[in-house]
Amino acid sequence: MSNSNVSSKSYGVDVASYQSTSVNYTGAKFAIIKLTQGTDYLNPKADQQIKSAKAHGLLPAGYFYANHSNSVSRARSEAKYAVAKAKALGIPEGSYLADDFEQGSGNSVNGGVQANTDAIMAALQVIKDGGYQPLVYSGSFVLRNHLSITRIIKSFGTCLWVASYKVSGRQDYADFNYFPSMDGVAIWQFTDNYKGYN
């Protein structure tokens, strides 16, 4: 999925193993599918979710849930694993591939801004070298307080996938007046409950 394939302000969804294998969401133009976590987990539904997204006309992309914290070597290893699985599962080169950097489930965001940023940049470089468009995903608080987004976007351009919710609960449409004011945003996740899908 390249920026030229999905127009600005298009809707998309992200799915993981706890969602259905049928990726058919009304109004969505793309789907970002969890592929891996760490270097030994593969989403058991990823293959079917990617095929379903394609069959329903959604452009598929992928992400891996980080377990690397602030370790550059682990970030590279996790990104290499994700790139290999993205290729094997049929995510087209040029599509987005994201490093999902959050607190919990084996990952810490508390390793210091410089070290965290070094790890993220190492992962994004592996993703880019693998033929994918790199993204880093997190909530706006983590992006602003635990990473140097200035360094990241200087090297990788518009590469942030930011979660920032105006309200909790079901949201059918984005309120673009609430859009997070930060540079480098490629994708804005405005809800965790899109049209009743969560």
Model regions and ranges:
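Short secondary-structure transition/capping segments
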Residues: 106-117, 139-149, 178-196
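A structural signal for isolated positions on well-ordered beta-strands in alpha/beta enzyme cores
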Residues: 61, 133-135, 161, 186
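Glycine-rich, charge-decorated loop segments at or immediately adjacent to ligand/cofactor-binding or catalytic sites
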Residues: 71-77, 142-154
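Aromatic-lined carbohydrate-recognition surfaces of secreted/lumenal glycan-active proteins
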Residues: 127-145
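Substrate-binding cleft of extracellular glycoside hydrolase catalytic domains
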Residues: 2-132
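Short amphipathic alpha-helical surface micro-motifs
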Residues: 80-82, 142-145, 166-171
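Short beta-alpha junction loops
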Residues: 68, 103, 140-142, 167
